[in-house]
């Protein structure tokens, strides 16, 4: 799993900064996935709903079929700390650049709260 250079870099970066939570951004769905299989880290659900209140996105558990080998899944399992996949935007990928300002506006609160949790 850590054979790709980008995977190795993300792994090493995560180990070096020891975050209290991680965010993995994807583009499709306006949903926040917060759980990995039966791993339910402390505060994971509560923070997910705070993110949802800030962004207007919905909160869902990661679907079983897609809940393998992702960054947040690895982090939750290895660290027992909250991890989130945040799906931004709706429409056909790649999303048009014209969507950026709205996506940024809806996600700024998530980024600020995540930074506060980390410190």
Feature map (PLM): residue ranges:
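Metallocarboxypeptidase
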Residues: 1-119
């Amino acid at each position: 799993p850590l054979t790709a250079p980008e995977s190795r870099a993300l792994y090493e970066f995560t180990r070096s900064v020891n975050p209290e939570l991680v965010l993995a951004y994807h583009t499709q769905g306006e949903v926040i996935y917060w759980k990995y299989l039966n791993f339910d880290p402390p505060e994971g659900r509560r923070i997910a709903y705070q993110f949802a209140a800030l962004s207007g996105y919905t909160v869902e558990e990661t679907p079983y079929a897609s809940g393998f080998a992702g960054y947040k899944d690895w982090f939750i399992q290895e660290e027992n700390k909250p991890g989130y996949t945040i799906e931004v935007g709706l429409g056909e990928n790649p999303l048009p650049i014209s969507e950026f300002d709205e996506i940024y506006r809806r996600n700024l609160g998530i980024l600020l709260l995540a930074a506060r949790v980390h410190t």
